[in-house]
Amino acid sequence: MKIVGIKRDSIFSPNSVEKDRMILQQVLDGLGDSIKMIDEKMLTSEENADVYVSMARHSKTLELLKEKENEGALVINSAYSVERCERGWLNEAMRIEGLPIPDSEGKEGYWLKRGDMSAQSKADVVYCKDRAALANQQASFVIRGVTNWIVQAHILGDLVKFYGVSGGFFRYYYPNDDGISKFGDEELNGEAHHYDFDVDALQAIAERVSMLTGVEVYGGDAIVTASGTFYIIDFNDWPSFSRCRNEASEAIIHYIKNKINS
């Protein structure tokens, strides 16, 4: 049984390169001795394995991993599922499924988000205070060559980050409590009020998005309002799990071993 780890390219790990490497390394260490980790841009068709433990996001790498899947290899997360985390596709799919996401209209401003891939820089997810600012930022996106985007209304409430692994592992945290941030956008929601909400319901919705995409190792963001209503504002394949790395790595190892033995 040959296992290979695929490390995420730094362009898709803004301010998180080492954190992403650490969670992948811990998982590989738990799966066996001296498992090779390859940068996703270095993966070639000649690199054959039974299992690919992958954090890859480059389109060329995903195409290669899809070929490996089609040939019978186990890939976690599946390259097909990672493609379905594209914001444009996922936002529409969640809307059709009736899952709780922000409307495109609101009174507290807007978020303009790159829709064709995960954010690579702060410029890919931008807060706009009104329609005029939104139009200006959309023009800036076009100048940068970005024409695929989504618009979400800004929602007042607590920002919650959640992390999950298929099979039951689920944790959530308030980033404004510990100050860990990629781009500092959390400050727009202010200090966390820790509004009461149904954690089991949030986990159930997160697991539905996991099933919708096929992503088995995932993370995301939600906004919890004062009334306890929550909205999913982001969902990603294999985050760094920096707030719960040890627990998460054990859950991922257990999940992958079960998949191998099933």
Where are these regions (language model features)?
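A short beta-strand motif that forms the metal-chelation/ATP-contact edge
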Residues: 49-53, 113, 162-164, 228-243
